[in-house]
A protein has these predicted regions:
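Cell-wall glycan
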Residues: 13, 54-55, 60, 110, ...
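Secretory-pathway/luminal and periplasmic proteins that interact with or process carbohydrate-rich
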Residues: 38-45, 63, 91, 110-119
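Substrate-binding/active-site groove segments that recognize
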Residues: 47-68, 83-87, 104
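Catalytic and substrate-binding regions of cell-wall glycan-acting enzymes that process beta-1,4-linked
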Residues: 93, 97-124
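Export/targeting segments at the very N-terminus of extracytoplasmic proteins
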Residues: 1-40, 78-79, 85
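Short glycine/serine/threonine/alanine-rich loop segments
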Residues: 25, 66, 97
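A short, structured beta-strand-centered segment in the mid-to-C-terminal lobe
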Residues: 69-80
Length: 124
């Protein structure tokens, strides 16, 4: 990784920590989640059409529910991280503060967690 990419990644990690802290999320949990989702690549596209740092599906962004506002631009690191943090917090709150279920719902959807279903695309 070049020095420029390394610096950009560290800047994005710091931004993720700040956004998480402002929402009362564990900053390291959020950083680990974003690292797992995209490796802090704001241009990452997932196989199912997920976009950006938090690997958000456009359909989730269009109608997130749970009082979460849609992001303007999922490729914009700030917009994506803010949406991702808000959505993660909403999922955690939806499951009564249960971090494990909240993170699972972030990845698979609240309905799938309620049904105990883990989609094949998220099993690895």
């Amino acid at each position: 990784m070049s020095q420029t990419n390394s610096k950009r990644t560290e800047d994005l990690r710091n931004l993720a920590r700040t956004i998480a802290e402002k929402r009362g999320l564990d900053p390291e949990l959020f950083v680990r989640l974003i690292n797992q989702e995209s490796g802090f690549d704001p241009n990452r596209r997932g196989a199912a059409g997920e976009i950006g740092l938090g690997q958000i599906l456009p359909t989730t962004n269009a109608d997130p529910g749970f009082g979460v506002r849609s992001a303007n631009d999922l490729f914009d690191p700030v917009d994506n991280l803010v949406f991702s943090a808000n959505y993660l917090l909403a999922m955690i709150n939806n499951f009564g503060g249960d971090l494990e279920k909240g993170v699972a719902a972030y990845n698979t959807g609240a309905g799938n967690v309620e049904k105990g279903i883990i989609p094949k695309s998220t099993q690895n």
